[in-house]
Structures are given as C-alpha cells and as structure tokens.
Amino acid sequence: MTIKGRRLSVWVAAVAFTITVAALTGPRQPGAASVEDVAMMKSADRQKMLIEGAKKEGKITWYTTLIVDQVVRPVKEAFEKEYPFIQIDFYRGNAENLVRRMLAEYQAKRYDVDLIDGTVSPVMVQRAGLLQRFYSPFFAEYPAELKDSQGFWGSTNLYFLTPGYNTRMVKLNELPKTYQDLLNPRWKGQMMWSTSRGSGAPIFIGNVLMSMGQEAGKAYLQKLKGQNIAKSTASNRQILDLTIAGEFPIALHIFNHHAYISKTAGAPVDWYAIEPVTATIQTIALAKSTPHPHASMLLLDFVLSEKGQKVFQQSNYLPAHPKVPAKQADLKLGGGRFSKALYMTPDLQFDKGNEWVDYFQNQFLK
C-alpha cells in the first residue's frame, strides 16, 4: 500500500468511527471523578489528589512510537522511582499500528490505553474524538508551537531534519549551503532521500512550499526535480547508513541526531543545516476513556517537566522543553549550528500531508 493509501485507510476508519464515538465512553465507578474532572484539575491540592487517586489505580498503559530501550525504559524507571506505587506498561508500534489498535479497542468497548504518543498519531485519534483535553502546570513553560492550543497534546521531544554527508566524499566547505545551492549541476545524481511521509521527501516539499510560498516553492521544486535525487522506501536511518557506506555523498533529509550518534561511533558522517530546517514534534496525549486518569496525569506532568525532560536528554533524544538542552547542544534550534526552523506541527502534517504526498508522487515519481 502506498504511503497515501496507508494514511487514508486509517482516516476513513476514524471518520466512520466518529459517528458512534459519543456512545463509547468508558465506565466510571459511582461517585468517582470523571476523566475530564481529573484531566482539567487546577486546584491548589491538585498534586495531592492525583497521588491519592493514582495509588488506587496503580498502573498506566502507554502506547508509544519511541524506541523502547533508548528512552521508554529509562522514562519508566525514573517515573516508577518517583512514584513507586504506579507501574507503567507500554506497547510499542508505528503510528498506523497504534491508531488502528486504539480504534479497534474503543469499537469493542475495551478501554486499555491511557496515553498515546507520536508525531501525528495523537491528532489522528483526536479527530476521531478519542482524546481528552488536559491541563498541566508545565504547559506554561512551553512556546505555543510545542503545545496544543486546546490542550489535547504536549511535546516530549523534537526532531530536526537536515542533510547528512559522507565526510570522506565531500568536504564541509564544498557542501550546498542553501536550497538554491542544491540546484548546482555538481549535485545532480549525488543526493538521496527517503519517500517516508513524515520525515522524507514529502515533508521536505512541505517545508519548501510553506517557506517559499506555493508559487515560488513549486517553481523551485520543478528545478530540484531535475537533480535526479535517488529515492528509496528505506527509513531515514537506512538512508544515512547508505551515505556512510558511500552510495551517495549527501543524504538530503535525515534526523541530525542520527548523524551525530554515528559520527561519535566513528563513522565518516556529519550533518549540517540548510535553513529553515524542517522540525517535527513528538507529542503525547491522554485517551478519552483512560482507565487510570490520576496516574496518567502524573506521567504527563513528569515527561513535560524539566526533570522528565532530562531523561530524554540523557537518552540522546532532543528535549522539547526550552530550558533543557540536547546532550549535544548544537543539535537543537538555537544551539549554535542553526537559528531558523519550520515546525511541522501534528495538525499541519495531518491537514497538509496528503497534498505534499500527492505532489511528490506526481512530480518526482513519474
């Protein structure tokens, strides 16, 4: 199935499901606070009430797209040390898998999931009516682009997409430094990118169209098309590995922290910025019928706090919190190597993603 087809199949299911979602709210114990009451709590004794409720609940189920050994387990260990009366269970999958799983569970009136994360998946289930707005005192520490205006999601970490290059094949001072420089005949047939919807060519196209404007952006992309960029369905990580192996000197759009990790391991690779850099956001959200709302709110507060964000930092993820730098500081916006980034928010990717995929398929794959 194509990247567009996969995306649409989930959306069609979500739309159909919206018709009945109002009737599929989970059961609550008589006299118990509603999920909304707990999620939106702002009283002075909020922390005390969350802890009291969480002790009765005892667990959380977290659906995640994050790498388990790199960051999920460290977050679990740090949180359970802070709150030893709560156990985190997690299920790891890609975005489509998590969305399908959650939709199927709600259709079956089985309410297992408490939290769901991803760059787009929370918005997908939000549009199906399956998320609960929530309040966290830590929202105040984040800029507008890193939190949902209605309170449906917060941010745990960031991804910055930049070119990566083989340091044995090309020197830093020879690299194309701007989008216009990519059109230099020298780079024809010398670049490679992934067809991945959320991190490859389509989102690169989205950056160009948004930063240059539709008319100028499409004119530019027509010229870029003539550069014969090699395309692969491989992940961005695999594209970078091919660059390290010498298949192409430049990987056009990869996660900069992947290049850093490989470089520190001794690989002949580095990254550099063409501004504005494409940025995507890992978000986390609360399920509408979470069976463990008190415990879930404690975990949401934890991952949004500076303390929780430092777990992401030590796991070589790029923390979303403005006051928590990356372990390698220059990987983040404002860390010294780039100063302009275009944030592709989950809503923006959801609303414009098909348009960018269509353009890529019609102009670069034919």
Label the predicted regions.
Residues T61-E77, I88-Y106, R110-E247:
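Extracytoplasmic ligand-binding site segments that recognize negatively charged/polar headgroups
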Residues A329-K366:
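Extracellular/periplasmic bilobal clamshell ligand-binding domains
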Residues V35-Q47, K55-P74, S199, Q282:
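Extracytoplasmic "Venus flytrap"
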Residues M1-E57, K366:
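Short, low-complexity disordered leader/linker segments with a strong preference
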Residues P122-Q126, P249-P268, N316:
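A ligand-binding cleft/hinge motif common to bilobed small-molecule-binding domains
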